[in-house]
Swiss-Prot record:
Subunit structure and binding partners: Can form a complex with MttB.
Span of domain B12-binding: 94-217
Protein induction: Induced by growth on trimethylamine but not methanol or monomethylamine. Part of the mtbC-mttB-mttC and mtbC-mttB-mttC-mttP-mtbB1 operons.
Organism expressing this protein natively: Methanosarcina barkeri
Pfam families: B12-binding, B12-binding_2
PANTHER family assigned to the protein according to its UniProt record, in alphabetical order: METHIONINE SYNTHASE
An annotated Gene Ontology molecular function: cobalt ion binding
The protein's role, per its UniProt record: Acts probably as a methyl group carrier between MttB and either MtbA or MtaA.
Keywords of the record: Cobalt, Metal-binding, Methanogenesis, Repeat
Pathway note: One-carbon metabolism; methanogenesis from trimethylamine
SUPFAM superfamilies, per database record: Cobalamin (vitamin B12)-binding domain, Methionine synthase domain
Family to which this protein belongs: Belongs to the methylamine corrinoid protein family.
GO BP term (any one): homocysteine metabolic process
UniProt protein name: Trimethylamine corrinoid protein
Amino acid sequence: MANKEEIIAKAKEAITDFDDELAEEVANEALAAGIDPVELIEKGFTAGMEEVGEKFGQGELFLPHVLAAAEAMNSGIKVITPEMEKRKSQTKSLGTVAIGTIEGDIHSIGKDIVASMLNIAGFKVVDLGRDVPINTFVEKVKELKPQVVASSALMTTTMVNQIQIEEQLKEAGVRDQVKTMVGGAPVTQDWADKIGADIYGESANDAVAKVKAALNV
């Protein structure tokens, strides 16, 4: 049987090789070996995702590669999630995050990973899905009173809709009741600052860390 370091290395490899089946296999192997799921995700899957992200930034890989890597990571996380849910039921929620992919954008993989990581970190996550109308984000803030509302955009053409969330939350009189987070491949800190978003999630790990910091949890 492989030791912990080998299993974690294999988890990273599954992501950098865009291998869904290997990611699932490694996740099952890790659970059987009693490896902490959070450690597997952070040192294995996320480390692999960060490597893919760096290569994408350097022009060595392209968006389909990033999506394939994210798909593999999602496959692994799905295996681990039931175990994480079991643990989470024994601890107090850190807060509620409503998250969705912005209107006009059918890509959900990045949003799915961030949602999974927030869930694992101890937040109650309300997944609004993909191609979510702006008014749905606003209505969910009024209805659920989450601490954070997050929108993901994978295209520059849909990214502009994130401005509408900020504006419509203000019009509805609830902007000061919630933190807003934006993320996605074309999204930057400059963009978040420009539109007035509270949090920019560069990666899933970054999003979790910044949500925790923003809420002081």
